[in-house]
From Swiss-Prot:
Localization annotation: Cytoplasm
Transmembrane segments: none
Any one GO molecular-function label of the UniProt entry: nuclease activity
EC number(s) stated in the UniProt entry for this protein: 3.1.-.-
Keywords, sorted A to Z: Cytoplasm, Hydrolase, Nuclease, Ribosome biogenesis
Pfam families with a match to the protein in the record: RuvX (PF03652)
Keyword Nuclease in record: yes
Protein name: Putative pre-16S rRNA nuclease
Function: Could be a nuclease involved in processing of the 5'-end of pre-16S rRNA.
Sequence similarity: Belongs to the YqgF nuclease family.
Organism (species): Chlamydia trachomatis serovar D (strain ATCC VR-885 / DSM 19411 / UW-3/Cx)
Any GO CC annotation of this UniProt entry: cytoplasm
Length: 148
């Protein structure tokens, strides 16, 4: 059976300590679209609960977290460990597939796109860049899996 024929819904997540960008795609078209940001909560458990509510609302079958792998393998960031912990919490709370996807430079790419293509200044780029980065992460994942 072709995996693309099953009903699927994907949530792409670009995690930040203040804001979390979100993107969504569902079958049959699987076109990733930015759906906004969620403010990070005071704890990872509260943040996970906020994300789980979106996951349930949209009947998400797979969550794709952007995982900021370091350019040099020796350096891991605190954000990376928070992402891993948050992903594990969501996995526990939902029992759906949670994937950590290499997102190196997706935020920088989103910033460049908003600056050059949209002509937005730094303040105007602040909020949309997170959800655009999540869209780029989800698009990269879907392209690699050829789920369209």
């Amino acid at each position: 059976m072709n995996i693309a024929k099953q009903q699927q819904a994907f949530l792409g997540i670009d995690y930040g300590k203040k804001r979390i960008g979100l993107a969504f795609a569902s079958s049959p078209l699987l076109i990733p679209l930015p759906i906004g940001n969620v403010e990070a909560r005071s704890s990872l458990t509260l943040t996970a609960q906020a994300l789980v509510s979106i996951i349930k609302e949209r009947a998400v079958t797979t969550v794709v977290f952007g995982n900021p792998l370091p350019m040099q393998k020796a350096y891991a960031s605190s954000v990376q460990s928070e992402i891993q912990e948050l992903a594990a919490l969501i996995q526990e709370m939902t029992a759906i597939e949670v994937i950590l996807w290499d997102e190196r430079l997706s935020s920088a790419q989103a910033e460049r796109m908003l600056k050059s293509d949209c002509g937005l200044n730094r303040k105007q780029r602040k909020n949309p860049s997170d959800s655009l980065a999540a869209t780029l992460i989800l698009s990269s994942f879907l392209d690699s899996r050829k789920l369209y």
